[in-house]
Amino acid sequence: MHITKLNLVNYRNFKNVKLHFHKGINTVIGENASGKTNLFRAMRLLLDNSMPRSSTKLSEDDFCRSLGPWKGHWIIISCEFSDISSDEASQSLFLHGNGNIDGESEVVTKATYNLIFRPKAHIRQALSILPPGDATALEECLSDVSIEDYETVLTGKSTANFADPEEYKSIVGDFDAIVFPSELNNPAVGVRLPYILNMPNEVSFTFIKALRDVVSDFHNNRTNPLLTLLKNKSGEISPEDFQPIAELIGTLNENIEGLPDVCDIRDDITSTVGDTVGDTYSPNSISIRSSLTDDSDQLFQSLKLFVAESNDVHEGAIHEMSLGGANLLYLTLKLLEFKYQKANQSIANFLLIEEPEAHIHTHIQKSLFDNINYDNTQIIYSTHSSHISEVSNIKNMNIIGVVEGNCEVFQPATGLSDPQCGFVQRYLDAIRSNLLFARSVILVEGDAEEILIPVLFKKVTGLSLDEMGISLVNIRSTGFENIAMLFSDERIKKRCSIITDLDDTFFDTTIRNTDSVPLKKKKKKAQGSKESGQSRKTALDTFCTGNQWLKPFYADHTFEVDFIKSSNSSYLKKIVNDVYVDPATRVTAKGELSNADIAISGVRALTMANHQGKGWFAITLGNAINFKVVIPKYIFEAIKFAHGEFKPELVLKVLSHRYQRIVEHVAEGTMNMRAAEAAGNLVLKTKWETYLAPYETGIEIFSPKWEAFDLLIDDIDDIKAEFIADFPTENNHFLERI
């Protein structure tokens, strides 16, 4: 038996989500504070018998905050099971409580188990007789409701689809239209289960939290996994096999008791008592006995585990192990415990592991979760480790994300064929699997974009893509569709920008008879690239049409050419000496880069990139740029789409960054101007004065406005407009688009 679905309605940060699970290993992925711990707690409320009974009595803090006023609403935690065993114990449990009979066979194959936290009957009755649409009556009815007016019920055999908001309204009520059902106990909610049918007592359920103190667990007889294993094995030892051990223990006890020193102490105690209280009040007899047990269960409890870690030969006790080693050992013992489960000892085994990466090395993470597989145990683990997600089966994956302020759960394999899933599975290595954790994604085709886009954005805005929650992924080809298909309404609801080149020509490609053979080949290749770019655009536009989560953005030519077209030639001229060694080539390159004709400067930019290698060229260029660089429009628009609206707080950070860089730039320029003056170079001094004058004027005008600005009171758009106006020589056009 295994869990197939889990539905959470109005529970903590989940307003209404459905998770899908499969046999074997399942992964729950989500960033910090996404709700992974809340999800596991919900499952524990249903199935973990180590949770106190009182924990099912929820509080107002357990209601989803995005719900608004909680009074009158229900919290629903609903679980569906499949592949229920045909053995008598399983069938009897579910037939009378939770199960749904499969056709004419009268065998239970599926079952539901629900925890419902709802208003008591008198509150539901009062709501049912409210006049439709009467908001005042609803407010009055709920005004005195407290958490004490709520009850927890456990039900089975439910038919309701709790994930459907309309079905929720039909069962609970429509709080907007103020219409509530007259039926107080809708049969779709299921049959209320008697306390004798206690699911947590029928399943084996273990929860391993992220920062678990496993050393304490090993010292506690109730939670020691080694002791559980030994108990299972001790029951298999026949009395005949154990008899020689019992006899040895009996002999050992007799030998200890018969030691001369022990006998002397016994005799001294007897005589001292007699001397003290006299013969009348002295004990009849006194013995000192060895209490080594010959009971097999108690003997096994005395056994302790000693381990030599992989880099050590000394076998030490558990408390001597590293934290990671102890956690790994605890985890493997729990898995072995499930493997040893006796027939019909429990109807199912569940193991929940919270963020195993907390104590386990990355290589062990990958190895453990790549190889772990026990048929009789369903394992569900949460993670924000890209190393674990790399080896996770995408078909068995749930991703928790935030869409418009609400937590939602995505299944990335929904609707994908086996070959498509296989491709995605192979592609998502430890680096690329970051796209599963990010709030939004940008896909690029090459090294230049992967290296330079984060640098450009950081230099210009002072913000990192990581800070924006954007994961930039290098596809290393133009085959974006194979990964972009993950982002859709039915799979992952996250924004994904695609950046690629149109490879349009930027020089005359007319082939003439007078052209040399190499020139003809160059022109023909450029024409072919243009045609391929247009075909790629048509296909990509068609692929993204109608998908609100996907949008392509195109460089007219290539990254290098579009970069220089965006008024960035000065940065390319800075690195000419790093790219070329030959003095003549350096002079020629600088001259061509200064040419306003893109057919000349663009060719040189591309030649430099190809000469050094696009990846190394991007690194060299990244070291040369500063805050004055211009981000090509298509790149900025791709970032803007991926991130969404720039909130005032972010815009303020950008303005602060640019203002500080301008102040530093002027200070540095002033030093250069004074150095030129000291050297007697009046021409250079004058150039610096002319260059710095508009900046100094801008600082003088803008500084009082900046110091007086208060985000809580003033409009961010106003101070942004002032900044643009006061620094007219800056490339601040991007500010108008945020």
What name fits each language-model region?
Residues 398-738:
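Acidic, divalent-metal-binding catalytic cores of TOPRIM
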